[in-house]
Amino acid sequence: MSASPETSSDPPMQRRSRLSAERVLNSSLELLEEHGFDAFTVAEVSKRAGISVGAIYARFGNKEAMLRAVHAHGIERMVEQHAAAASPDRVADDLHACVVDAVEMVASVFHGNEALLRAFMRLGAVDEVVSRRGSAGSKDLARRFKEKVLAHRGELVHRDPEVAVDVAYRMAYCIFARRVMDGPAYESDLVISWDELVDEVAAACSAYLLERRTGVTTA
């Protein structure tokens, strides 16, 4: 863990530079959340952060490099959220409760960062570096989902618990990602609230993981 600005032994100029960069990154995240990727401008970031456009370019080089740094900063923040949401203090007593908890964990990351993730997804579509980093963040969330559910491995009826839990994660991830990217009525006219959607996805994942299916061997 890095030292805080107040306790850091960095020279004052270096410390000021780091704090200025943090202001730029945080202002950029706010701008992306409020107005999305298409409306993002260095001039607006400059105004919000109180740092000149020239100083921003001197620090980051160009807009592409700046957006990559902003994305890295945002993903780091989300990974911290993953860790908090997957806290060992929240271990469920049985598989059903554990699946519900795991699905709610995934939903909370998407719902809590809806506008920012939408901007990141659009940026990732045109920037391979951003896409790879976003994939790594998604896989971190997958790992935490699997750790939660596989803590009750003995209750799983699927012949391959690892595959089953991976598919359950993909179900939740893809449904919530689609909701964030395209809104509640892209693929269907029926509009479902976030809370109801989370409940239904949790029920679907629980049914998939808990119910024995005709003709499927568990050996």
Model regions and ranges:
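Amphipathic alpha-helical linker/stalk segments
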Residues: 8, 12, 72-98, 117-118
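Short hydrophobic clusters on alpha-helical segments that form packing/core surfaces
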Residues: 24-32, 74, 78, 106, ...
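Alpha-helical DNA-contacting segments of helix-turn-helix folds
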Residues: 67-74, 124, 134-137, 141
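Hydrophobic/aromatic-rich alpha-helical bundle segments in the mid-to-C-terminal region
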Residues: 118, 151-202, 212-219
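Hydrophobic alpha-helical connector segments
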Residues: 69, 83-112, 165-168, 198
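Helix-turn-helix
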Residues: 23, 31-65, 69
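Hydrophobic alpha-helical bundle segments that form small-molecule/ligand-binding pockets
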Residues: 86-92, 112, 117-118, 123-128, ...
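N-terminal intrinsically disordered/low-complexity leader segments
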Residues: 1-19, 184-185, 213-219
